Amino acid sequence: MITPQAALNRLIDGNELFYDEMLALMRQIMRGELSPAQTAAILIGLRVKVESVSEIAAAATVMREFATHVPVSDRRHLVDTCGTGGDKSHTFNISTTSAFVAAAAGARVAKHGGRSVSSSSGSADVLELLGVNLQLTPEQVGQCLDEIGLGFMFAPNHHSAMKHVAPIRKELGARTIFNILGPLTNPAAADHQLMGVFHPDLVGIQSRVLKMLGSRHVMIVHGCDGLDELTLSGPSMVAELKNGEILEYELEPGEFGFPLCELKDLRADTAAQSRDRLLAVLDGQPGPARDIVLLNAGAAIYTADIAPSLADGVTMAREALDSGKAKQKLQQLIALSRKLGG
């Protein structure tokens, strides 16, 4: 087993850690066996060298080992819409809104998320304002998935080992490997995923990581405007993993009949504003907010293997919104989470 000192010297020299070495090192970090100085040095060493696909996959594997898992009785069409965040765009909660639409279309959405990192509100912030009980046990989240096809996994409830790293990350104030691990560590082990990323380089990297981790159908996306979603401002970069193969391409919103818009049309400066925009979309209000939700929900439906193509996914998303079923999913989650959580 590699020592922290040897690992750090390897990173300083610009050399990659082997997969098994990264596994061992990450387990030490997650158990709190390294000093804060050692952990901080290794995290920054990885960042400066630039984390490799193998290193990220090993770290994600360990985080999954240490996570509190959600029991799921039916794994068909199980999808997550969790992105990295960190795009500093201050848009409303697009992926959270899309989750309700995808669930209404028949996907089983195991939504993983937390509080705000760099935006005005994270998924947990807006769901809490809507009245969803976040403090459910893993078994209760599994019950939500079984009964209504939608469950929210509040990250701190499932990744308690992060307590060893959280103060170090806060004190560093810099991005580390942990900024990209969240969407790779779904506690329900969803192997279908729509993941937005904050940097274009991560599109190819995360798709290869998820291939190593055994995912089935995934789209990793990054908008030309920096958005960690499929954007309406112009083309989005996409890496799609399906049947063990990765295809990289650009996706234009016009291909699906959506007009271009600017990021300011999607802005929400507070969690309350984000909640209001989410509700407006679910209530059927037309405009850019609805359009971007349709596009991203369509992608989630497609990656869940409910729809045979992204275009068909968008059509199903539109039907789910127009029928009122997406709004009903929100109401069902509020009611069931409150009932289960007492």
UniProtKB/Swiss-Prot annotation:
Cofactor(s) named in the record: Mg(2+)
Binding-site residues for Mg(2+) 2, renumbered to this chain: D228, E229
Coiled coil: none
Group of enzyme by EC: transferase
Binding site for anthranilate 2: R169
Binding site for anthranilate 1: G83
Pathway assigned in UniProt: Amino-acid biosynthesis; L-tryptophan biosynthesis; L-tryptophan from chorismate: step 2/5
Oligomer status and interactors: Homodimer.
Name the record gives this protein: Anthranilate phosphoribosyltransferase
